[in-house]
Amino acid sequence: MITGTVTDDEATVRLVVKGSSGKVQEVRAVIDTGYTASLSLPPVVIAALDLPWQSFDRAILADGSECLFDVFEAEVDWDGEVRQILVHEADAEPLLGMSLMRGFELKVQVRNRGKVTIKRLPTR
């Protein structure tokens, strides 16, 4: 199970992200259920982890505009297992998207310092 807290009306969790060169950094990510990819990170974190560039990706933002993202490869410690993921570069705070949470249940106590839990769903 992954846990976090609600701060300033944002549900957040801490994730350990690793680059192919072995560099590791813990990031605080805001959970965004409207974001369909796995994770976005700011350029400074991507550079610090020395993440390898993979490709470009287009996305529709919440305001309806289209944006082109650089996409990088990373590993993330997710509920005790290492997952290979694609990371969007975005000049904003890190976002945790729905793709990484697939197969998990998200619960949020929507109040200041409320508990956030992401728990693996039982297999069918």
Where are each of the predicted segments found?
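Pepsin/retropepsin-fold aspartyl endopeptidases
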Residues: 1-124
